[in-house]
Amino acid sequence: MSNPSSSGLGSSSGLTHFGIGLANTVQSEVTPYLPLPSLPIFCGAAEPGEFKLFDEVGQGSGYRSLDRSEILAQSSRIANMLHETDVSYLDLRNEARAPDCNSGEHFQLYDLVLRCNPGAFEYVTPGPTCDPLFTNEGPQKIISEPSVPVKMQRQTDTHLARSIEPEPVKRVLRPNHVEDHSWQHETLTNQSPKDVTAYDSRPETITMNELSASKKPKGKKKRKDDLSSVQPDPSVLQESIVQNFCEMLEDFCGRAEVPGDDRDEAEWSSVPVDEVRVLINELMTIRSKMLLHMVPVDILSRLLRTLDHQIHRAEGLSIYSEHSDSDSVLLVLGALESIHASLAVMANSDMPKQLYKEEIIERILEFSRHQMMAVMSAYDPSYRTGSKPAENLAFEGDDDDDNPDHDMGSASKRRRIVKNSKVKKASVNRISGAVNTALQKLCTILGLLKDLLLVERLSDSCILQLLKTSITTFLVENIQILQLKAISLIGGIYNSYSQHRTYVIDEISQLLWKLPSSKRALRAYLLPDEEQRQIQMVTALLIQLVHNSTSLPETSRQAASGNSILETSVDVGYLTKCHEAATETCCLFWTRVLERFTSFKGQDASEIKLIIENLVMDLLTALNLPEYPSVSPILEVLCVILLHNAGLKSKDVSARIMAIELLGTIAARLKRDAVLCSKDRFWTLLESDSEISVDQVCTKDCTFCLGKRAGNLLVCQICQRRFHGDCLGLKELDISSRNWHCPLCVCKRQLLVLQSYCKTDTKGTGKLESEESIENPSMITKTEVVQQMLLNYLQDVGSADDVHTFICWFYLCLWYKDVPKSQNKFKYYIARLKAKSIIRNSGATTSFLTRDAIKQITLALGMNSSFSRGFDKILNMLLASLRENAPNIRAKALRAVSIIVEADPEVLCDKRVQLAVEGRFCDSAISVREAALELVGRHIASHPDVGIKYFEKVAERIKDTGVSVRKRAIKIIRDMCTSNPNFSEFTSACAEILSRISDDESSVQDLVCKTFYEFWFEEPPGHHTQFASDASSIPLELEKKTKQMVGLLSRTPNQQLLVTIIKRALALDFFPQAAKAAGINPVALASVRRRCELMCKCLLEKILQVEEMSREEGEVQVLPYVLVLHAFCLVDPGLCTPASDPTKFVITLQPYLKSQADSRTGAQLLESIIFIIDSVLPLIRKLPLSVTEDLEQDLKHMIVRHSFLTVVHACVRCLCSVSKLAGKGVSIVEHLLQFFFKRLEAQGSDNTQIAGRSLFCLGLLIRHGNSLISTSGGKNFNLSGCLNLFKRHLRTEDIALKVRSLQALGFILIARPEYMLEEDIGKIIETTLADEANGRMKMQALQNMYEYLLDAEKQLGSEKASDNTVNSVEQGGHNVPVAAGAGDTNICGGIVQLFWDKILGRCLDFDDQIRQTSLKIVEVVLRQGLVHPITCVPYLIALETDPQEANQKLAHHLLMNMHEKYPAFFESRLGDGLQMSFIFMQSISQVTSEPNQSLQQKGSTNMLGKNDHASSTLTQARLGVSRIYKLIRGNRVSRNKFMTSIVRKFDNPTWNGSVISFLKYCTETLALLPFTSPDEPLYLVYSINRVMQIRAGAVESNLKALLHKDSAKTQHGNGAYQQDPIPGHMNMMDLNTRIQEEPRHWNSYGHATLIDLNGSVYQDSRDQFTSYQVHNGKADVHKMTSSDPPELSTDDLQKIQVDCLAAIAIQLLLKLKRYLKVTYSLNDDRCQAYSPTEPLKPGDPLSRQSVAFDLSETRTDLPSTYQDLVQRYQEFKNAMREDTVDFTIYSTNVKRKRPTPRKTSRSAKKTVAYNEDDDDDDNDDRGWHGGGGRGAARRLNYSTRSSNRR
């Protein structure tokens, strides 16, 4: 009895195995046997005498007896002081010494203090602000295994001890004892004696850490033996205890009852709180000894009745009220204690049913609910303010059931309520001790209510009230402990009352929306993890509910022995049903949540989406933690729902977007876990990978850490595996030197025992004493072994409660579902759950593993779950979403895929992902394409294999239309090259990047230059330590980059792109503007130039090295190096003239001129070498004489004999340079001139090849030797004779010789441009540029002009730089002065203007090359400013429609520059440009058609549908006009002028052969303009209305007059009417029948045309009228049958022609107007209210419908009979009637030049310009068929409402 470590168990020995929980309560029976608290009785004083209990100071020193009378008299005072004492500052846990009062002596003072206050020796928090309090427990050192964060249902097994908690935040201050803290395991939390905090009302997270599972079994056994030797007979002892307890109960009830005859309510006295607490202690004691059911029922009934009266006395009072006093508070506390006592009786198992009176239970629930509301108001001021107006109604019954959205208005409204309350949160330390005590008691009450659910089935009303009250706690802050109890209670209800599960889920989903925004995502639930992660309380509740949805089988609830498992018959499908129940819970919850999301829009939908995202993030945080197996199925069900109609297949775009985001987040987590498992091949994965025997070949390393740690290894005696003790969480003292078995073998043998047990028919005790006689070990799979290790861990760290049982059961349900053969092993699964009950040797089920190892096991097992296996399904659906029509969905899907890729970049190597991502490279949205590239680009550096796979598709994006996409593609390829020095596609990558050096966007050009600067020209860090060879001074890295440059040039078609790179690298002009403004660093410039010089030197060395190879191979190998050197010389020849030896390059390369190779490669090599020498010569002062002579001879020889003229050209130029440098004058040049001149005179044109070569060389010698000839005075050479010779050869019949003569003439004109001003030369040039000239002659003439302009431009540059030339050569003769902008003031401008019209005419030639050369001439002319830019605008606009992409781009570039510099000029010629584009389009179409096919009216009408080439040409033309419109779209005035100029073409069209086709072309062009704002189509409708207002009435009157005039004429016959041939003298006629005679002009395709004063070209009217003689493809002009109707006379036909043309133009405009109104949803009111002078409305959206525009059914041929004329009139009248309302509002303003539409009344709108058939007019467009006589519906049916069609 005096043993300090005694457990105090005075019951039978059968109870000693389990232990009674002593936490937070005082047990009267065992109190004398327990040591006093570690807090000394003198309350922390340094010396005992310093504690002044009395007024006088204590005498003496040392310890005096505490049982003195004067001290005993102060017991009540001591009790009060202890109650109010704050011991939170004491280190109670680590107290080293035990006070002397811990001896076996029993003090009388102790009993007296307990009588005054049973909780005196329990420490409590004085206020919510204090720090957590800890118990002082000795055995903390042996606590090693973390516990399961659980709160489990009470077991109903009558053979097990029960532990009921009174006040959950108190700690009994008793050292050196082991407490059973099972009551304290809240749902899903981890708490331990060392970590559990006292109640903390602050809003911070509550601490839920590890729970010790150490039970000190040896100490318990010893105590049991000691006690058993002195204990009396158990039955006698039980009777004695029950008898004493009954007497105590009678005494308690007697004190509460007032003696009297009547037992009214008023005659019950109030019992002090302390007495009720003493009663509770006694109840807990008798209950823990499992003797409460032995108390007579009448005594218990009387007790419950007495306690019920105590509760009844406090009804209506509140623990927290403004008017509450101390008496009220005591009554409330007494009532709460009475509830505690009542529930302690009723919640006990096997109690008589007479005790469970519904009246008492309802009063308990109602009073508890009321006090919970008061406590919540006290702890959360915002809740108190929000609930105050309805304080008495908020939770009364189900009053709010009629309004399910009570307090569920918009989230913004809820935020305003909280914000406007302006209630400052009360400091937590203000909360009274009474409220704190009440809160603690309410937590105890909720725990007992959960126990009550297991022993008594409550009514539905009670259950619903409990649920509503418990769920309400989640709306309040600072009461996290109460919320934990509520979670446990709700879980118990959910498990036991399945009929209310739907209601619970509904309430939880409602709770999510009711939470104020300030309390959402408040993560106060601490996970049992060392990382201290938290989740929301609501998430924890959801997890608990899913756990509790799997009801435990009765065998696991009631079986006291393992044998009962075999005896109880259970449905083999029970596990499946449990899993289905969990799935149903998940489905119900997510369905409710997602339904709420789809029912809201706007801000509320955004907040609901945020709630869902927070839930998912919480679940992912708890995923794969061993205590939360339900997280996986919760997320799995969510994914299944999101993959179907509620997510990706929903019609709601927002729902699909949210589904994509959530699925991407979840899939990324799955992939991240999979990567973790694949990288860390720890032993659990090795054990669970395959389903083979557990036995494994032993290794030298630790099976767990695989050798990552150091230390002594333990060897398993069975499998010989090795383990570190630290890896298993074992200490050296715990390790047995013999017969040590690893966890794998232990679990394997355990499973074999369970299998054998399930097969046996033994009906004995049900427990196996050993694991012997085990056979067939191969039946156990590796996965089962690892699973059992997890189950053992959960059972070891679990409490006496059954939460760990639920968790283990849930795991078994999941595993049962995933194993196909498990249906035959149901009892085996039950046995695994009850392994400890079956196997008596508890050591066989003890888990040795640390928590880290268990977490790894959980992760490994999770990878095999159906949830993890669903990753591929999620990924496939996300990839499918990349093909959605909506760009925002595609962008979100791409973002989701990118999150997955972030988790594992190797996903990009998946073929499915690669195809999907590459498909997004070609997405229609620029943002999606850029995002797809960004996805790949982020992982290029870290995963080179990804770059190789995607290189080809990324390279294609370098040509993307989006600037940002092109730039991103360039950066990605740059990263591929820099991150991988051995990148196999480096040369191809450089070639792709180099192709963008000519990009239209300057920023892209700068990026390309910067990229190559980083590749080649940037100085690398550090010093050069490695060189190409011993004799070389070239660094090795520079040699490598030079080779890269050589390889790149071999992949490019020409050197120009590389030349641009080198030029800009030398200038460093690609840096940002800020860097340019600060000035380029001269050091950087010098560094680049030095590297370029070294590259040239390296190239020269490579050329010398290749020279040693054979001749054939040498040419091929040396050519790339020479070409790169050529490129450097093109930029700056000074790079090849080193200061140490300027002639080095000339002397080194000169021997190559002796090559006899006659191949194209050899010719290219010679040409480049000659150019390099020619470039360097002007920079050299003097060459050695021998070198000069060799050069002259070699060049002369090649000029005479080389077969490639390009080499000859280079030789002539170089020879002239050598002659200038050598100072020999013109001697050698004149010699060659005489040689070729005499050869031409002697042979003439007999030998075409020799003559052509002579002409070519003669012209070149004159061009390049002009300065030498001029210096010598030309005494020995007759230039006039050469000109005459060239003219003579121009008159030959051989076209090749004529072209060569024209080329030679061009060479002379370049040297002597003044000759072009002579009349005969001018005629030659005009003739060769004429339409009818031969194509080769036109091409050569243009080439001559182009070379002349380039040469003039070059001379201007050389003259400017002549002062800096090393050796200036005097220029003689006639130098052509060219100054940009000088225009006509110099000879160059005069020459260009002389032939400008001819050059512009060639811009529209049907030959592609001729157009391209002409356009280049225009570019040079505009650059030099030689002509007025307005003259070429129409031609450039026409070339925007060129089928050749190069011509399109150059024309567009020139137009862009012109629009920036001369916007007025540009806009004034847009209309003419449109007409020119139409002429050009017709020219191109006709050239490709049949040669003899005439241009027919019907053919041109059906041009879009009949001729594929014509259709593509027209489409190209309209696209070109659209590009032009985009240039001016930003300026309102400019775009309005453009549209007005086109609409005016319909105002007064002049009849010619192609006028109708042109009007249709204009109509389609206007219809397809890329409008971006409503102002644009509105202005076009406005312009159309103006034309209609002026012309429609007159045209109708003229047509009607013609009909009345000829009404007497009759028609007969029904054949096809054909018109007479139009007389040949018919000329162009306008609408006023004036005949126009225009000068004739021949166009390029041979037809006579007419040019008006504006330069517009029209076809001759006679050609057009002739074309109309063909009708329906049959030429039947002169054949007329007798049945044909009377034809129109010539005079009538002339009049009808003008009016019908005007009618056709108006009908086209009406059709365009109708199309605009339907496409852009423009109604009548909007069109009529529009005014072009009104300011634009910013942000006005433009809605556009996809409607095709078709003019194929519009009749545009002329009427040939009066019947046709009547039909045309009727069609025109119908079209006018349908559009009457739109344009008649302008009738009142006809006289105004610029009518301004204004809002008028409907009556005003009825005023019409024509009066006939007004009764048929209506205000809508019903029955719009357009073609009155035909009656057929149009192909486009604008079946919208009338208000939307105007």
From Swiss-Prot:
Residue stretches of each HEAT repeat: 243-282, 298-335, 438-460, 461-499, 532-572, 613-631, 632-672, 781-818, 869-906, 945-982, 984-1021, 1053-1097, 1113-1152, 1174-1213, 1227-1267, 1277-1314, 1427-1464, 1475-1512, 1533-1575
Null phenotype? Defective embryo arrested at preglobular/early globular stage with the formation of giant endosperm nuclei. Suspensor overproliferation phenotype preceded by ectopic auxin maxima distribution. Reduced sister chromatid cohesion. In conditional RNAi plants, sterility, arising from several defects in meiotic chromosome organization (e.g. failure of homologous pairing, loss of sister-chromatid cohesion, mixed segregation of chromosomes and chromosome fragmentation) and leading to shrunken and inviable pollen grains, and degeneration of the embryo sac.
What spans are recorded as compositionally biased (Basic residues)?
Answer: 1790-1805
Give the superkingdom in one word. Answer: Eukaryota
Q: Which Pfam families match?
A: Cohesin_HEAT, Nipped-B_C, PHD
**Would the keyword tRNA processing turn up in this protein's UniProt record?**
no
Q: Where in the cell is it found?
A: Nucleus; Chromosome, Centromere
Residue intervals of every PHD-type zinc finger in the record: 699-748
Q: Which intervals carry biased composition (Acidic residues)?
A: 1811-1820
GO BP terms: cell division; centromere complex assembly; chromatin looping; chromosome segregation; embryo development ending in seed dormancy; meiotic cell cycle; meiotic sister chromatid cohesion; regulation of gene expression
Tissue expression per record:
Expressed in leaves, inflorescence and siliques.
Read off the InterPro entries from this record: ARM-like, ARM-type_fold, Cohesin_HEAT, Nipped-B_C, Scc2/Nipped-B, Zinc_finger_PHD-type_CS, Znf_FYVE_PHD, Znf_PHD
For this protein, the record's CDD domains field holds: PHD_SF (cd15489), SCC2 (cd23958)
Sequence segments annotated as region (Disordered): 175-234, 390-414, 1790-1846
User: Family, per the entry?
Assistant: Belongs to the SCC2/Nipped-B family.
Q: What is this protein called?
A: Sister chromatid cohesion protein SCC2
